[in-house]
Regions:
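Alpha-helical transmembrane segments and immediately membrane-proximal extracytoplasmic
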Residues: 1-441, 445-451, 455-467, 474-480, ...
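ATP/adenylate-binding site constellation spanning eukaryotic-like Ser/Thr protein kinases
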Residues: 183, 403, 495, 507, ...
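Short, solvent-exposed beta-strand edge segments and adjacent coil->beta transition regions
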Residues: 450-452, 515-518
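The conserved cystathionine-beta-synthase
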Residues: 455-477, 483, 500-502, 512, ...
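Short hydrophobic beta-strand motif reused across regulatory alpha/beta modules
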Residues: 490-498, 553-561
Length: 567
């Protein structure tokens, strides 16, 4: 198992490098288009149209090559991992590389982390299917690819594993954690050795200053503030997506969405792309990202510019990111970090202006990333190590731990679910209850019992009793199935009635004594459906039928379910 995890890690690192190469080539091409005209009107037109061109090309690529099944969110991946499935198409190994690079490379407002994770997951799934690996969960290498992708992009192997464990995997055990750990380490090592010049670390700053006991109060309040910002991102993202899908025509929805996106990015060019340049500026204390007015807004008073930029970051950036992802491709990972950096920096500036104390805005830019990331992704440990590994600010461990914990707690109070799991839980596909979640993953086939004896409807009850004593003297279930000649279920005979000879005469047939089951389940059902049917009908045993032809398979009881679940 572990050598295969290492293979997935190396392959994912290579594909992540290819994604960045394609992205940078698109950025160069977009800059070439921008520089072709020397007139101001040409450049303004290019700024407005380039995001539309990139998203349009991405959409055409998706429609022609991928069809309507193209997945752009991590929510379906979470569901596949929850169901232990590896049915990810082979083409997903390269489709996200091209699609996301077109969307983001031409100015779309999104990140490349989710496409990288989906690419890595597809690599893991293809390796699993190709090698026909036996004896391990089918989705194990899928999670290895996801961890390896984040590790390669951010050079953060620990945060990658923690994100997979906290946000993607349904359960955290030694067996589920060690393979992603190996894949993540191999991916980071391979990237460091062979691609260190091709993939830049997003932000590696040494301006993070020391913190003191007086900063603790500010950190506590910053945790609450970043929780509010994180919940705002979740709710605004869902609101924009819901509002967009109210437009029934796909063409009209695409045109309106892209027009709104282009207007937002035209007015606030700083929202374009992944936003790592702005994060880097804040981490070194450069307030240019907050004070420099774009050409389109230079007619406004300078004092108004920071307020407009902050409003755009907190309210328009989530909308722009969702529109980019919905109509093109990308992820919410980088936008979350972008908003978090501004949130932390803004909080520090306000705190200092109020005269409560003096805190380092650079420190709080990093702390803000941690807090908002923890609130949006519900991955507090991953948030801590992501900031530590990408900014090298090991001295901020305690403040990061505080803000991550507080933001996660308050974020969960305001919004119970992460941005990825909210839609899955709303559809009833997964549950926050670990017991129910496990039942959703177990098929009926794991728990049903093939009965050693069955009756025919025209049998006499006395003959049925003799048959049971002869064929299955230790029969432990509470009823015996009655089958028709074609193998379909006719009914059930209670074992209590069968043993109580006073309830029937010598001429009583099984058909006269049997009863219809309160409900039936199929071999394709999961155990959560079975338990719900048992609770609804107030029975402890149900017959299982084949889904294809409705023929009898066996019986499933609550005892067998709990026995299987508690193993």
């Amino acid at each position: 198992m572990y050598p295969f995890a290492a293979i997935v890690g190396v392959l994912t690192a290579i594909f992540a490098y290819l994604l960045h190469l394609v992205l940078f080539s698109n950025l160069d091409y977009a800059n070439l288009i921008y520089d072709q005209g020397y007139s101001l009107s040409w450049r303004i037109l290019a700024v407005f149209l380039l995001p539309f061109i990139g998203i349009f090309l991405s959409k055409v690529f998706q429609v022609l090559l991928c069809g309507p099944t193209f997945v752009k969110s991590l929510a379906p991946l979470i569901l596949k991992l929850d169901r232990n499935r590896d049915d990810i198409p082979f083409k997903d190994m390269f489709t996200h590389i091209i699609s996301s690079a077109l969307s983001v490379g031409f100015g779309g407002s999104a990140g490349l982390e989710a496409p990288s994770v989906l690419t890595g997951s597809a690599i893991g799934a293809c390796v699993s299917r190709t090698l026909c690996i036996q004896g391990i969960p089918r989705s194990m290498l899928v999670s290895c690819g996801a961890a390896a992708a984040i590790s390669a992009v951010f050079h953060s192997p620990i945060a990658a594993v923690l994100f997979v464990v906290e946000a993607l995997l349904p359960e955290c055990t030694f067996r589920t954690t060690l393979p992603p750990l190996i894949a993540s380490a191999c991916s980071a090592a391979f990237t460091k050795i062979f691609f260190s010049e091709g993939i830049d670390q997003a932000f590696f700053m040494n301006t993070i200053g020391p913190w003191g006991p007086r900063d603790i109060i500010a950190v506590l309040f910053c945790g609450v503030f970043t929780a509010v910002i994180g919940v705002l991102i979740i709710k605004s993202s869902i609101w924009v997506g819901t509002l967009s899908h109210k437009i029934k025509s796909p063409t009209l929805r695409f045109m309106i969405g892209c027009t709104i996106l282009c207007v937002i990015l035209f007015l606030f060019p700083m929202l374009r792309g992944q936003g790592y340049d702005s994060i880097e500026q804040l981490l070194v204390g450069d307030i240019t990202a907050l004070t420099e007015a774009p050409y389109q807004l230079q007619w406004l008073p300078p004092a108004l510019i920071p307020c407009l930029i902050l409003l755009a970051v907190f309210f328009l950036k989530p909308a722009a990111s969702i529109l980019t992802i919905e109509h093109g491709d990308g992820g919410i990972f980088a936008p979350t970090m972008f908003i978090g950096a501004f949130a932390g920096f803004f909080f520090a500036q306000v705190f200092n202006r109020l005269g409560i104390g003096h805190i380092n805005p650079c420190n709080f830019a990093a702390i803000g990333i941690c807090g908002v990331f923890a609130a949006v992704m519900r991955s507090p440990l991953a948030a801590i190590f992501l900031v530590v590994e990408t900014t090298d600010c090991f001295g901020l461990f305690v403040p990061l731990m505080l803000v991550s914990g507080i933001s996660s707690v308050f974020g969960r109070m305001m919004e119970p679910y992460s941005i990825y799991k909210k839609s899955l839980i709303a559809q009833g596909l997964i549950s926050e209850d670990p017991l129910e979640n496990r039942l959703k993953r177990l098929p009926v086939g794991r728990c049903f019992v093939s009965t050693p004896v069955t009756f025919k409807p025209d049998m006499l009850m006395a003959d049925a009793f003799s048959l049971l004593k002869t064929e299955a003297p230790s029969y432990a279930l509470s009823c015996v199935p009655v089958l028709n000649a074609d193998g379909t279920l006719a009914g059930l005979v209670s074992l209590k009635e069968l043993y109580d000879t006073t309830t029937y005469t010598s001429t009583t047939t099984v058909e006269q004594a049997m009863r219809q089951p309160a409900a039936v389940v199929h071999d394709t059902d999961t155990l959560d459906k079975v338990v719900k049917a048992m609770n609804k009908t107030k029975t402890s045993i149900l017959p299982v039928l084949y889904f294809e032809d409705e023929k009898y398979v066996g019986l499933v009881s609550k005892e067998s379910i709990f026995d299987k679940y508690l193993r």
